[in-house]
């Protein structure tokens, strides 16, 4: 039997721009596509 916790769209192509990203509980959805801007790097240790 399959694991019911895994969503069926886990195996869908996840390239930036192929799927609409909605802001939800998962912060990763917000961090993926920022419409052409550079990735925001947050340094946690050292400098």
Swiss-Prot record:
Residues 29-47 have a biased composition (Polar residues). Transmembrane segments: none annotated. This is Small, acid-soluble spore protein N. InterPro entries: SASP_SspN. Induction: Expressed only in the forespore compartment of sporulating cells. It is found in: Spore core. It comes from the Bacteria. It comes from Geobacillus thermodenitrificans (strain NG80-2). Residues 1-47 are annotated as: Disordered. Keywords: Sporulation. NCBIfam families: PRK09398.1. The lineage of its organism: Bacteria, Bacillati, Bacillota, Bacilli, Bacillales. One of its GO terms (cellular component) is endospore-forming forespore. GO terms for biological process: asexual sporulation; sporulation resulting in formation of a cellular spore. Belongs to the SspN family.
């Amino acid at each position: 039997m399959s694991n019911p916790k895994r969503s069926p769209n886990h195996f869908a192509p996840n390239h930036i721009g192929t799927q609409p990203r909605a802001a939800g509980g998962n912060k990763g959805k917000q961090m993926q596509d920022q419409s052409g801007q550079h990735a925001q790097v947050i340094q946690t240790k050292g400098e």
